[in-house]
Amino acid sequence: FGSGTVIWGKKGTAPQNFARNNGNPFAALMSYPDVPEGIWFYNEVKYGYDNGIMTGTSDGNFGPYNALPRCQFAVILHRLAGGETVPFEQRYPDVADGMWYTDAIMWASEAGIISGYSNGYFGVADNITREEMATMMYRYARYKGYDTGARADFDQFLDGNKVNDFARKPMSWAVGCGLISGKYGQTVLDPQGQASRAETAIIIMRFMENIRPAAEVSSVSLDRDRIE
């Protein structure tokens, strides 16, 4: 193969090693059985896969319709930030040292991006809601120094008055800048509804392409997500 020939294959396999050793461009093949080409979230899932931001579950699938636990979203944001290591502190009774999500939660807590509940727990396995995700994305954008000035009026949504106070500004920003859109013909926000993994992939790609400055976008190679 010439040095300009694109080598296709799965990550971590012989084709990737060949491309690396011979200076060829490498294009990763995504092979989730539950994410066929042409499905409405395929491009976003592949974007997350290619950039090492959001990968599959332990059974080899992506789990697009599965709800996303809070600990997994902490891991995703940690990947976006480059995987900074923060010393462990016993901040939450349900976050032990040495777990696959511990570093991410320590970092996100230290950065003020994710906080626990009023009872002191983090809620590791609790499924993240749409308004919680908007809030964490908003805090992450502020942490990175990105523009968070966009705003949207909730009056266009039938349930706009159901957004909790803590999430009103973040949700207004997320809708205003196009990260989160309404459901059922743009009629409802569903703020307390659970965010699926497919929806999360879409939101992350929108953030990376439209909010995060293009010069900062880089691939991050990290371990796959896990479902506990």
Locations of regions flagged by a protein language model:
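Alpha-helix C-terminal capping/helix-coil junction sites
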Residues: 49, 109-110, 175
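Ankyrin-repeat and related helical/solenoid repeat scaffolds used for protein-protein interactions
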Residues: 1-4, 157-163, 176
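Feature responds to low-complexity, polar/acidic, surface-exposed segments characteristic
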Residues: 29-42, 51, 55-104, 111-131, ...
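Solvent-exposed loop and capping/linker segments of extracellular ligand-binding repeat ectodomains
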Residues: 1-30, 47, 107
